Amino acid sequence: MAILRLENGTTYTQLADISLELAKLNVTLNYWPIENEATRQLLKQASLTDEEKEIVLTSLDGYFEQLKQEAGYQARDLIVLHPEIANLDTLLAKFERCHTHADDEVRYIIDGEGVFGFVFADGSQGELTIQPQEYINVPAHSEHWFHLTASKRVKAVRYFTSTAGWVPEYTETVIRFPSLTAV
């Protein structure tokens, strides 16, 4: 289950409490179960071939269809990150800085875990660890960052209305959250 840690030391582990805090940012967090047993078995593998990725994506297309109808999403892909990927730290570095996007950042974590950091309207910061079967929508222009946990493993479906709006626009905000340096 998701864990929200605020800069002031407060930690939330209940979805209702987390949702109340995230509502201040218009961030949406949902639980989307993975019911297909074959998909769950594929997700146990550290890496996936392109064919296996497509099998996983197809098995989860019910969620994609919902997003297409409700919000006009047009594309999705599956990103698989693990420690054996060459230059993983270099790849992740561009997301570990505070940035925004012109479009929503929508992720469905299906294996592993990742951490989204946020800057609240009052300037305070928080980090949300999201785990398998959790879906997050970070609204366009929300100041945030992303990093992996110490396991450095995640499989996430990324949803796009267009890929053009997903280019990071870096801000000068200093991340004060201590966990980024600990990873």
UniProtKB/Swiss-Prot annotation:
Residues noted as binding Ni(2+) in the record, renumbered to the chain: 99, 101, 105, 144
One Pfam family, short name: ARD
Catalyzed reactions per annotation: 1,2-dihydroxy-5-(methylsulfanyl)pent-1-en-3-one + O2 = 3-(methylsulfanyl)propanoate + CO + formate + 2 H(+); 1,2-dihydroxy-5-(methylsulfanyl)pent-1-en-3-one + O2 = 4-methylsulfanyl-2-oxobutanoate + formate + 2 H(+)
GO molecular function annotation: acireductone dioxygenase (Ni2+-requiring) activity; acireductone dioxygenase [iron(II)-requiring] activity; iron ion binding; nickel cation binding
Details of cofactor binding: Binds 1 Fe(2+) cation per monomer.
Necessary cofactors: Fe(2+); Ni(2+)
EC code: 1.13.11.54, 1.13.11.53
Class of this enzyme: oxidoreductase
UniProt GO BP: L-methionine salvage from methylthioadenosine; L-methionine salvage from S-adenosylmethionine
Site (May play a role in transmitting local conformational changes): 104
HAMAP family hit by this protein: Salvage_MtnD
Function, as annotated: Catalyzes 2 different reactions between oxygen and the acireductone 1,2-dihydroxy-3-keto-5-methylthiopentene (DHK-MTPene) depending upon the metal bound in the active site. Fe-containing acireductone dioxygenase (Fe-ARD) produces formate and 2-keto-4-methylthiobutyrate (KMTB), the alpha-ketoacid precursor of methionine in the methionine recycle pathway. Ni-containing acireductone dioxygenase (Ni-ARD) produces methylthiopropionate, carbon monoxide and formate, and does not lie on the methionine recycle pathway.
Protein family membership: Belongs to the acireductone dioxygenase (ARD) family.
PANTHER family in the cross-refs: ACIREDUCTONE DIOXYGENASE (PTHR23418:SF0)
Assembly with partners or alone: Monomer.
Listed name of the protein: Acireductone dioxygenase
Origin organism lineage: Bacteria, Bacillati, Cyanobacteriota, Cyanophyceae, Oscillatoriophycideae
